[in-house]
UniProtKB/Swiss-Prot annotation:
InterPro entries: Ribosomal_uS10, Ribosomal_uS10_CS, Ribosomal_uS10_dom, Ribosomal_uS10_dom_sf. Involved in the binding of tRNA to the ribosomes. The keyword Ribonucleoprotein applies. SMART domains: Ribosomal_S10. GO terms for cellular component: ribonucleoprotein complex; ribosome. The keyword Ribonucleoprotein applies. Belongs to the universal ribosomal protein uS10 family. Keywords: Ribonucleoprotein, Ribosomal protein. Part of the 30S ribosomal subunit. This is Small ribosomal subunit protein uS10. It comes from Neisseria gonorrhoeae (strain ATCC 700825 / FA 1090). GO terms for molecular function: structural constituent of ribosome; tRNA binding. Pfam families: Ribosomal_S10 (PF00338). One of its GO terms (biological process) is translation.
Length: 103
């Protein structure tokens, strides 16, 4: 489409899963003749939590946990209807959150 691009943002806790999904999207888009910019790795969001190990005493003994959220960004330019149909039929793993915007 003229002067429009598809922006795809992937979010997952497992970096291997998100990289595999991004590679699938890139291969599918290139197979249909679209131009793909990316995947661009965005900064990893790290959430850290401290919880008490003991339910009663020992306040100084704590467990430290963290959740890492990995992000990837891709832009698909010069796309056709064939590209959108192929992307809609693409089956991605359940652990990957996909956000698609047409700009």
């Amino acid at each position: 489409m003229a002067n429009q691009k598809i922006r795809i943002r992937l979010k997952a806790y497992d970096y291997a899963l998100i990289d595999r999904s991004a590679q699938e999207i890139v291969e599918t888009a290139k197979r249909t003749g679209a131009v793909v910019k990316g995947p661009i790795p965005l900064p990893t969001k790290i959430e850290r939590f401290n919880i008490l190990r003991s339910p009663h005493v020992n306040k100084t003994s704590r467990e430290q946990l963290e959740i890492r959220t990995h992000l990837r960004l891709m832009d698909i330019v010069d796309w056709t209807d064939k590209t959108t149909d192929a992307l809609m039929k693409l089956d991605l793993p359940a652990g990957v959150d996909v956000e698609i915007k047409v700009q």
